[in-house]
């Protein structure tokens, strides 16, 4: 006898990689995004952040694993999500604080930092309802964030 849910998933197992379809549907409705872009898992954002940093440390995001580099830095918009900061601290990643402007991080500062510091590999950002302020990044801020080097991570 198979135990199935509405979606014909065997619910006796661990579930799908992207999370429960019903949770993803709710997330899509709340965030006004397509379900295909929504992940729903245990404390998903924190889990994803930790997994990504671990992958970059051991596999890299460009030419070499980050753990082979002398210094790894990530830009941290402030005020920001304390879990971003805790992950960086735990993994020995240098945090560079950049103030929020009302449209996201001050991109003039970000661009200057990235241009002059090869150790910077990315930026923590939550462009929609940024924690803890609720700030929403402007289209210009998002576009400017996407222009950096191949090993830049957002």
List each model region and its residues.
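Conserved core of the PLP fold type I
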Residues: 3, 7-153
